[in-house]
Amino acid sequence: MCPDIGQSSSAEESPSSLYERLGGVYSIAPVVDDFIDRIMDDPRLNANPLVDEAHHRVSPSGFKYLVTEMVCWASGGPQTYTGRSMYDSHVHLEITEAEWGFFMEDLATTFDQFELPSSERAELVSIVESTKPDIVLAEHDERRTTS
């Protein structure tokens, strides 16, 4: 477990924002690093040739930076997300419901590895789920053939 995630010295001193309860950027970054490595290597996600190509086109360190920035911002931290919108980043990838499910399984595996407390886990899942309409944009789950 990342030492600071979900730990505080007493209920009275319990941080109010999710960002603070997660331990800030230095606790969030290793979780994001693990998750990004996991999704970039997931053969179920890379079976989508558009996702596979994107995973090989982007710099893993840049991708991790932007996702860390976004998680920090979305959880109430002082960071500002500077990347593209979720829609603009994913519209061309034709991500399916099934691929979203694999993505969420990878997220759960990362949360398990870092022993993320259930309340923080639920809040983060809610944040991630709020992005689904801008990410899952394929018209159906059958892989389209490209010429």
Predicted regions mapped to residue ranges:
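Core of compact, soluble alpha-helical bundle domains
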Residues: 1-147
